[in-house]
Amino acid sequence: MSEARTGGGAFHLTEELRDSPFMRACRREPAPHTPVWLMRQAGRYMKEYRDVRAKHSFLEMCKKPEVASEVTVYAAHRLNVDAAIIFADILLIVEPMGLELEFARGEGPAIHNPVRSAQDVDRVREVEDVSALDYVYEAVRITRRELRPGLPLIGFCGAPFTLASYICEGGGSKNYVHTKRLMYTDAGAWHALMSKTARALSRYLNAQVEAGAQAVQIFDSWVGALSPDDYREFVLPHTREVIRNVTPGVPVIHFGTGTAALLELMKEAGGDVIGLDWRVRLDEAWARLGDVAVQGNFDSVALFTNPEVVRARARQVLEQAAGRPGHIFNLGHGILPETPVENVVALVEAVHELSRRR
């Protein structure tokens, strides 16, 4: 793996898992076909997911390991993807940090005691012990038992910047006023918040690995709001800390959206795989990034078309990769709720068929 890692903990990797197309691609080794998995592959576009969701709140689904595992395994096997990703949410970690989290139906997540000042940063708890999230690790353990033996399981977390932005804004944002105000006016408080967040995330990821995840993804969904200079000064050291502290040997996927101006800096922060959105050509991004695996970058809105268009657009992405080892096919964003399931199935089938090495 590309990073000099200092993290500890067990890493569960059988020979069958090590040799899977997904794990081979993470190591930039040739695979029998281009591996494919999809962000939010367990989600509202599936009737079976909606049936489960009708019985539980979103947080209940995350906090009931059997339920989280059920939707994870069902989606992975139904779609025949090359990796599963545990059903959870990037914001679960904020509760042990002392922040009040709510998912109101139809309104998205809200943090009721946001951080806006140095005094607020002081009250954010240092998460030395991540056992409060044992429901996530139990979901990982159950899922690892229930998945096909050779199918890798991905754990994940939000990146320090995206998590800190939620913490400062108290929810979603278009302009990140509270986040950037703290960043620009009190750099000390900002770095203190990011450091606390990064340490918590490292421990959280390693606990998922110890429970049975074979790889991890770090979601920096909001980092495209930053200039390269701001990223380097206010974000890069903290994301690098998270990645360096992941258990050695575990592939790290470093994903962001709107990051065309930040790709080289993201690589500098670390990751064995850089996740790309649809706004940058895969071949051009890869030329800039050099010796690293890439993940992406099908536009999730194209899944609203039909199987023929889906197949044609999948071919375009694969042609940009040109069969080079180290490409993991994915979307540039999560699957949207109204997406026709048959188009998602068609995408996975097309990737497998079109990329099969003769």
Indicate where each model-derived feature is located.
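Short, conserved acidic/polar surface loops in the N-terminal third of protein domains
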Residues: 95-99, 114, 164-168
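Active-site loop segments of alpha/beta catalytic cores
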Residues: 132-358
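A glycine- and small-aliphatic-rich helix-loop capping segment at beta-alpha/alpha-beta transitions
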Residues: 100-109, 169-174
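N-terminal basic, low-complexity leaders that serve as flexible interaction/assembly modules and, when applicable
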Residues: 2-105, 142, 236, 240, ...
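A gly/proline- and charged-residue-enriched helix-loop-helix capping module
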Residues: 106-146
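Short glycine/proline- and acidic residue-enriched helix-loop micro-motifs
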Residues: 54-57, 118-128, 183-190
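Iron-associated oxidoreductase/ferritin-like identity signal
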Residues: 2-6, 14-15, 122, 149, ...
